[in-house]
């Protein structure tokens, strides 16, 4: 191996040494030689270990090379030199640079990390680091992919040594974080075998973190975010500049700060979890993003741009559309009539690639992902074609590093895969131990879940990715945290757990450490936060010190366990390799690979295992990559396609086009990760390591999937390496699987490898579970109790952000007929603006606003008082003049007596007033006298606007008092003039007991329930809201309407933390807003149909809620039979559109009172209008007022449905709903009934009398003539068996015409009206009819008979007679 350790960073080039993964084996030179390590092939030679796991005591000479693999630098034997570019070159594909990272991990353990840290900056200084170096490093890393050598250091090596200049995987355990998919593959192949060669790519290899590039600039570190490269080199050296990415890697010696930085970076890169374990390597990589060594053009490119090679039109790269082929065609062919080429265009010289990309959508049934457009980014990831993606895999990753890259989304995806692969790399440490390749799946799963960590240090580390820089590191970290004043008992327990866990081998120890670290992470944030550097260093130390109680216990574990972990690691490596491969091949849908949590180990190869682990742990089998990432919890629900390959298509939404994962809880919000993954890192940061660690906790949070729901997340582990782990945990968290589930999956995964170990892992997992779950109650707002009912005093200000008035009024003004002369109830009136505005502009008879907040009701009354005009009386003026004198005296006294400074202003005002009063006193008197005189004069004079020539009445006749006559007698005086028609009451509309609803009366024609349902729901639960709906229905008169503006479910979440009661109710809600409609139209409530009045536009989309109108049936005596109360069991569909009316022939003057015999009773009944409605539930009440109204039905095309004026089942709104086609056919003529012209005029539908209710009552007065004024309409009956088809025989059809109805003189004062049965042509019709029972015909006939009999009997007869129309 050509190792050139140049002390100067400039010289530090990773030569392409032919180093093979052997170096990784060197890592085996952990304190306890791992039998497995030798498995890595030539690398096994400890002496050879490139990233030598320096013996704990050794401080390896820091190697100054741009790659800053701190481990390598530390490597005493210049093994790290492999990092040098040339070595890399020499190594060609076989560079064991990864080993360097591993060794440096050991070195770090030794404490050489500090040196490494120092060197790294120097390395950073080195200009020579360039893409080539990075590539070399990557190659080396790939070779080192085994990471076993590093693993040798109690798992420190690769992970711990992640700081190794070239060991991009420093924590990767030899996986080398192959950001570049191909590199990852190669590394997996080579690294796993330990002897495998890694192809040297001039391009940055995706699999490798090209740490070298980042000379150690913090800025650089951001660039290198790609694959969690941020993780600083083990030494922490790696990227001091990288913002502590190194620390995150926990390269043993990395400082906590760096670790935090790494975490952030890695989060940016999307490898937050990786950041911790592989952080060191990551850190380097992260540095490379903006390495000063690279000129801008030399920056890592996401990929080398691969020009398209497939031209469907036969063109080539310079003529993609094959336009040149048109030049050769005959002019005739080019003529406008025939533009198609005579022949298929010849193919361009550039041949189509032999491989045809086949993009398989994740959901074959929804290839364009239109059904669930949750996150375009994820979906695109799923669809990206493998070919495009595979290209320069590393480039993609790098792009991820670069926030500014346009394709960063894809990178992220890739990155995720890489991250998984990264995890795999870390797992790779174990992987180098490749001794037991058979366990790859288990290993991958192990890597996938931090829980597995105890078993597979490498794998588990991998899983924790960044959580535990290296198994050893982890162990140390656990110890250290223990030692390092674990701030939280949890962290202490974590360490203890690590100690307790008797991991059989150093690897096991590392795993234990990792476990401890995981625990730490699960431990409260403070622990995590407790100097991530320290933790990392401790981890490194632990790796070295495997002997430490925990570590020693781990070390004690049998070598076989070591092997197991090793195999697990190799499995992880394989998994990561596969993941990378997958990443490279966009076509593959790597759900698991997308799963960050699984750490990529589960990507392709750990599929099942990783999915089991990952699913339990939040990583492997999940669909959402992001979920897996630390962010996964946050954005868990948003990133569905993260795992999928992306397709670039004008149809398929491009990444980020749909929904960006919420960055809400990112503590690192300021730094926007280049990828969503970065969010995941932030998320991990958000979660306290402890919180993150316990999958259970996360699952708890998982319910409220967006992490933002859990307030504490942001607090914890923001800067701690644990936070990186938290990334892994996040995956776990993202998975809602319970810890137990995780344990089980872990057990299964490991079980294949080592049955004995599975229990350990499970116990480990359980331990994190023991840590208090995140399920803590959220922090409730201080003002939550005050505003628990949504009684915001500034609510109107929010509603009217973009309008001078409430946008809902625009909708109401299009349906004025719903309000005019109606008794209205406004539930939740707040400060009364809507109530007052409706009263002013829509002329209701009365409107009552109620609210549960007494203060708001008081303010509403004050607001109303503004509109109450108090007439000025002259007496008042005089009286005021006198008090001014008294006031003057009083004020003078006050001025003398009160010395309070705060009263000065008031006093001054008072004084001024008094003086003015005194001064102008006489003037006022004069003014009053003049005013009085002027008023007297005015009273004698006729004002111009009041002037009406006396000759006009003589010449043209008197002006008929139309208005007064049209007004119903009920409208006494100013009853519905504005200020007098508004009332406010303080009350809770939700009754304590449903039995209290029995006392409700039908007193309203219209109920407004605007933006109140959410607050009723949150405060009183499902039962309270249902009770409120029932009460609304009960309080509506027949034909009454409910205008409902319900908040959508998404808005509930924002208010669930107001009070503990609301929080609990929120958790228990099962009656979601999308079920309101069905419920209101169900027999339990009884509304007959609904109609959408409109959806107001508002700048705040939260206020753009549809306004629904629900109509209560018109229960005339005959209608009652069809009413829900009368026949509650009657099955009918939600939308009834069965009734239509034939032309209205109004007789007698305009008023119902003029309607013949009705007139006498009409006035008397008008007075009882409010009470009559109470009788609706009984078939008989005074007169058939509603009967008459029901006859007066609005045609189906009319947009509004006037209460009491139309049949409750009229189809006016149904025509537009759900393609319900109601054709009203007259069985007589078998033709489709259409309203006559007279019906098409709205005037024919509005009663001449003032109120519709009055009109109805008018009819009642006549005893039977319930339909006042002879305004009888023919009724179209619902179909029965005889008439249900247009072909119904004429006999039945004629029988259905009720001659009896016509004969009833009481009913038909205005003339005869006939009823025609309607045929419901749509099966979906929701007619009230008894649905298609054979008895329907008999039933209808029976009704008809009853009507005929009752029709003869006076008023009640008329009522009973009413019509079958309701039937």
UniProtKB/Swiss-Prot annotation:
Function per UniProt: S-adenosyl-L-methionine-dependent methyltransferase that adds a methylphosphate cap at the 5'-end of 7SK snRNA, leading to stabilize it. Required for SK7, but not U6 snRNA stability. Required for dorso-ventral patterning in oogenesis and for anterior-posterior pattern formation during embryogenesis, possibly by binding and stabilizing 7SK RNA, thereby promoting formation of a repressive RNA-protein complex.
Reactions that this protein is recorded to catalyse: a 5'-end triphospho-guanosine-ribonucleotide-snRNA + S-adenosyl-L-methionine = a 5'-end methyltriphosphate-guanosine-ribonucleotide-snRNA + S-adenosyl-L-homocysteine
Region (Disordered) residue spans: 1-107, 143-181, 323-355, 381-443, 468-559, 608-734, 894-927, 1150-1203, 1236-1281, 1345-1367
Annotated Basic residues bias: 78-92, 397-414, 901-925
Stated name of the protein: 7SK snRNA methylphosphate capping enzyme bin3
Composition skew (Basic and acidic residues), residue ranges: 705-715
Residues annotated for S-adenosyl-L-methionine binding in this entry: 808, 828-830, 851-852, 988-989, 1010
GO biological process: developmental process; methylation; negative regulation of translation; snRNA modification
Tissue expression notes: Distributed throughout the early embryo.
Subunit structure: Interacts with bicoid/bcd.
Signal peptide segment: none
GO CC annotation: nucleus
Disruption phenotype: Severe defect in oogenesis: females lay eggs, however, up to 50% do not initiate development and many show a dorsalized phenotype. Among the eggs that do initiate development, up to 20% fail to complete embryogenesis and of these, nearly all display severe head defects and die as unhatched larvae or die soon after hatching. Mutants show anterior pattern defects and fail to repress the translation of caudal mRNA and exhibit head involution defects. Mutants also display a severe reduction in the level of 7SK RNA and reduced binding of bicoid/bcd to the caudal 3' UTR.
Annotated family: Belongs to the methyltransferase superfamily.
Ranges of compositional bias, category Gly residues: 1260-1271
This protein's UniProt keywords: Methyltransferase, Phosphoprotein, S-adenosyl-L-methionine, Transferase
Organism: Drosophila melanogaster
Domain of life: Eukaryota
Post-translational modification Phosphothreonine, affected residues: 1116
Iron-sulfur listed as a keyword: no
């Amino acid at each position: 191996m050509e190792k050139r350790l140049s002390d100067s960073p400039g010289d530090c080039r990773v030569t392409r040494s032919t180093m093979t993964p052997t170096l990784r084996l060197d890592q085996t030179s952990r304190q306890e030689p791992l039998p497995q390590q030798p498995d890595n092939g030539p690398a096994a030679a400890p002496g050879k270990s490139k990233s030598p796991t320096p013996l704990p005591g050794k401080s390896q000479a820091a190697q100054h090379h741009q790659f800053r693999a701190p481990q390598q630098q530390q490597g005493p034997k210049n093994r790290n030199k492999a990092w040098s570019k040339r070595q890399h070159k020499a190594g060609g594909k076989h560079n064991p640079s990864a080993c360097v990272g591993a060794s440096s991990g050991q070195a770090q353990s030794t404490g050489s990390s500090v040196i490494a840290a120092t060197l790294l900056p120097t390395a950073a200084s080195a200009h020579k680091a360039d893409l080539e170096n990075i590539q070399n490093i990557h190659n080396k890393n790939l070779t080192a992919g085994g990471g076993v050598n590093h693993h040798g250091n109690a798992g420190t090596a690769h992970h711990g040594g992640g700081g190794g200049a070239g060991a991009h995987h420093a924590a990767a355990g030899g996986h080398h974080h192959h950001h570049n998919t191909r590199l990852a593959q190669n590394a997996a192949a080579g690294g796993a075998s330990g002897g495998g060669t890694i192809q040297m790519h001039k391009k940055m290899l995706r699999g490798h973190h090209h740490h070298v590039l980042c000379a150690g600039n913090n800025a650089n570190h951001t660039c290198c975010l790609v694959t969690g490269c941020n993780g600083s080199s083990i030494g922490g050296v790696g990227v001091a500049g990288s913002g502590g990415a190194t620390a995150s890697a926990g390269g043993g010696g990395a400082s906590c700060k760096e670790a935090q930085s790494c975490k952030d970076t890695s989060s940016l890169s999307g490898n937050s979890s990786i950041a911790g374990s592989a952080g060191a390597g990551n850190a380097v990589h992260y540095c490379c993003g903006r390495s000063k060594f690279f000129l801008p053009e030399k920056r890592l490119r996401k990929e080398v741009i691969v020009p398209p090679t497939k031209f469907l039109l036969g063109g080539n790269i310079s003529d993609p559309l094959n336009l040149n082929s048109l030049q050769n065609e005959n002019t005739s062919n080019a003529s406008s009539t025939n533009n198609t080429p005579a022949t298929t265009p010849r193919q361009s010289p550039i041949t189509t690639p032999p491989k045809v990309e086949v993009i398989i959508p994740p959901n074959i049934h929804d290839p364009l992902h239109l059904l669930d457009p949750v996150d375009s980014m994820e979906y695109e990831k799923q669809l990206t074609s493998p070919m495009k993606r595979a290209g320069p895999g590393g480039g993609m990753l790098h792009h991820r590093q670069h926030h500014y890259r346009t394709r960063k989304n894809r990178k992220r995806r890739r990155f995720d895969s890489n991250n998984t692969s990264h995890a795999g790399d870390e797992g790779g440490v174990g992987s180098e131990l490749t001794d037991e390749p058979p366990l790859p799946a288990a290993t991958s799963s192990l890597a996938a879940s931090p829980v597995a960590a105890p078993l597979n240090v490498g794998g588990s580390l991998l899983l924790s990715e960044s959580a535990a820089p290296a198994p050893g590191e982890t162990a140390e970290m656990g110890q250290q945290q223990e030692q390092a004043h674990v701030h939280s008992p949890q962290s202490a327990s974590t360490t203890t757990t690590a100690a307790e866990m008797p991991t059989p081998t150093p690897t096991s120890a590392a795993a234990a450490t990792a476990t401890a670290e995981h625990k730490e992470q699960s431990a409260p944030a403070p622990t995590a936060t407790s100097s991530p550097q320290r933790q990392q260093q401790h981890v490194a130390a632990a790796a070295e010190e495997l002997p430490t109680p925990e570590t020693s216990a781990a070390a004690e574990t049998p070598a076989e366990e070591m092997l197991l972990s090793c195999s697990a690691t190799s499995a992880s490596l394989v998994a990561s390799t596969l993941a990378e491969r997958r990443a490279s091949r966009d076509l593959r849908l790597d759900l698991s690979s997308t799963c960050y949590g699984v750490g990529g180990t589960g990507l392709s190869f750990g599929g099942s295992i990783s999915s089991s682990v990952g699913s339990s742990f939040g990583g492997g089998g999940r669909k959402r990559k992001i979920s897996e990432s630390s962010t996964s919890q946050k954005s868990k629900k948003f990133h569905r396609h993260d795992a999928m390959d992306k397709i670039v298509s004008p149809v398929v939404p491009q990444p980020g086009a749909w929904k960006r994962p919420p960055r809400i809880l990112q503590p690192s919000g300021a730094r926007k990760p280049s990828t969503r993954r970065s969010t995941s890192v932030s998320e991990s940061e958000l979660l306290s390591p402890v919180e993150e660690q316990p999958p259970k906790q996360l699952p708890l949070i998982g319910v409220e999937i967006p992490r933002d729901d859990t307030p504490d997340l942001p607090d914890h582990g923001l800067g701690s390496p644990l936070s990186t782990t938290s990334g892994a945990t996040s995956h776990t968290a993202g998975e809602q699987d319970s810890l137990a589930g995780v344990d089980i999956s872990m057990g299964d995964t490991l079980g294949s490898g080592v049955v004995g170990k599975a229990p350990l892992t499970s116990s480990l997992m359980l331990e994190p579970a023991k840590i208090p779950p995140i399920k803590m109650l959220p922090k409730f707002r201080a003002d939550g109790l005050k505003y628990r009912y949504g009684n915001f005093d500034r609510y109107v200000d929010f509603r009217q952000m973009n309008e001078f008035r409430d946008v809902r009024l625009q909708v109401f003004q299009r349906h004025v007929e719903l309000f005019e002369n109606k008794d209205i109830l406004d539930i939740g009136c707040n400060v009364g603006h809507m109530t007052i505005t409706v009263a002013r502009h829509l002329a209701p008879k009365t409107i009552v606003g109620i609210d549960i907040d007494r203060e708001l009701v008081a303010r509403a009354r004050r607001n109303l008082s503004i509109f109450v005009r108090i007439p000025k009386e002259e007496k008042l003026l005089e009286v005021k003049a006198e008090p001014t004198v008294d006031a003057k005296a009083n004020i003078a006294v006050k001025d003398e007596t009160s010395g309070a400074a705060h009263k000065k202003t008031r006093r001054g005002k008072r004084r001024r007033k008094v003086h003015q009063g005194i001064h102008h006193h006489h003037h006022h008197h004069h003014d009053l006298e003049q005013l009085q005189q002027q008023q007297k004069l005015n009273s004698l004079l006729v004002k111009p606007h009041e002037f009406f020539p006396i000759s006009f009445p003589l010449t043209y006749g008197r002006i008929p008092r139309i208005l007064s006559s049209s007004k119903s007698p009920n409208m006494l005086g100013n009853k519905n003039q504005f200020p007098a028609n508004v009332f406010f009451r303080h009350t809770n509309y939700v009754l304590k007991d449903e039995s209290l609803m029995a006392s409700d009366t039908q007193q309203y024609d219209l109920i407004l329930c605007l933006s109140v349902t959410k607050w009723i729901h949150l405060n009183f639960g499902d039962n309270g809201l249902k009770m409120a709906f029932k009460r609304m229905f009960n309080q509506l008169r027949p034909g009454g309407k409910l205008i409902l503006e319900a908040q959508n479910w998404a808005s509930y979440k924002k208010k669930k933390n107001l009070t503990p009661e609301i929080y609990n109710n929120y958790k228990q809600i099962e009656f979601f807003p999308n079920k309101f409609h069905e419920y209101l139209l169900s027999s339990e409530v009884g509304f007959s149909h609904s109609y959408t009045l409109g959806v107001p536009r508002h700048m705040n989309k939260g206020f753009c809620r549809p306004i629904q109108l629900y109509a209560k049936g018109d229960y005339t005596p005959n209608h009652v039979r069809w009413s829900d109360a009368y026949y509650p069991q009657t099955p009918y569909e939600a939308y009834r559109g069965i009734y239509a009316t034939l032309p209205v022939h109004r007789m007698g003057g305009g008023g119902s009172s003029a309607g013949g015999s009705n007139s006498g009773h009409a006035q008397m009944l008008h007075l009882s209008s409010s009470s009559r409605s109470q009788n609706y539930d009984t078939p008989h009440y005074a007169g058939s007022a509603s009967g008459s109204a029901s006859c007066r039905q609005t045609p189906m095309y009319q947009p509004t449905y006037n209460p009491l004026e139309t049949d409750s089942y009229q189809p006016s709104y149904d025509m537009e709903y759900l393609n319900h086609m109601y054709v009203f056919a007259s069985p007589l003529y078998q033709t489709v009934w259409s309203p006559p012209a007279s019906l098409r005029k709205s005037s024919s539908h509005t009663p001449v009398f003032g109120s519709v209710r009055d009109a109805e009552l008018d009819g009642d007065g006549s005893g039977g003539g319930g339909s006042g004024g002879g305004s009888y309409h023919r009724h179209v009956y619902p179909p029965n068996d005889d008439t249900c088809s247009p072909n119904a025989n004429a006999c039945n059809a004629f029988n259905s015409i009720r001659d009896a109805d016509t004969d009833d003189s009481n009913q038909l004062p205005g003339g005869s009206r006939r009823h025609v049965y309607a045929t419901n042509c749509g099966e979906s019709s929701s007619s009230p009819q008894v649905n298609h029972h054979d008895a329907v015909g008999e039933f209808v006939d029976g009704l008809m008979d009853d009507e005929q009999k009752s029709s003869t009997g006076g008023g009640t007869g008329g009522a009973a007679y009413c019509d079958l129309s309701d039937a």
